[in-house]
């Protein structure tokens, strides 16, 4: 991953416990640290803080107040712990004086929202997180509690508590706000061409013969498909001994339905379809799985013990066992994975969302050996 975590030094104004970064004429980074230690690592959100030569701006101090001014913004700050009374920013391009000034802590009432973490349990309208465009002319992204990337790509927690905000003061230049966000967070990767075609997915217990016959029927009717998404019944579900728990998580082919997985996937490839399998990783790797002996050895567990390999993406040994297992299935012909996580947002590392890290690790893994990366989540 190409990252530029350091803000150009010419765009940084700082004191003992505060730091302001001028990334663009409308985008500022605002930091407070009681210890005076600031974060210059890449976060899970911010991967590029160097936008090149900073825009022209001026600074001045009068009556104990710092003023930082760009062509688009005017910041006023009392150089003390951030407060509503001591930190404010005027967005020059917004004529409405009721909304053109942000004070630290203000609610984002005009925010036009961004994305949702997941559509699980959605039935109609759902709450969305704040985005970077707003009818008020400004928005704030709080990056204070986001985990960090280490130099080797591992994910680590922040060392020090503090405040780390990004102020988007683009007025009603919404496209410019999104463009600055893309520069900060990294450009969206290009999808492989086949992903833009028709996909087939149905929660139905297909046999391999039924599925291939369905693809042939689609072709005969002139309905083209480029992607076959196969739901959870590709693996053992009802045949799992209750002592292991449910069959929700599984990695062993159900050979009652799909007796020859390699042939089945090969048949789909011959028909021009890329194949994705559904996975629910929450229950880890249990003793009934074909891959259990290998995974147990990787974890230092005796395969004879039957002890489950618990799901824990903060453990490098589990990560290795987990992806070795997926690589073996890919050798059968699986092209990419449908990451179907529905079990909450907690890992053993504070601030690290299991769905986020699953998506990140699977996406990076899918890019190995020069492949064009893709996941469904």
Language-model features, listed with the residues they occupy:
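A low-complexity, Ser/Thr/Gly/Pro-enriched, surface-exposed linker/loop concept
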Residues: 23-63
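Catalytic and substrate-binding clefts that recognize carbohydrates or anionic sugar/phosphate headgroups
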Residues: 59-195, 202-203, 208, 213-220
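Aromatic-lined carbohydrate-binding/catalytic grooves of carbohydrate-active enzymes
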Residues: 189-346
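Short, solvent-exposed loop/turn and secondary-structure capping segments
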Residues: 41, 80, 87-89, 142-143, ...
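Catalytic-core region of carbohydrate-active enzymes that cleave or remodel glycosidic bonds
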Residues: 327, 351-375
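Short, Gly/Pro- and small/polar-rich lid/capping loops
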Residues: 1-7
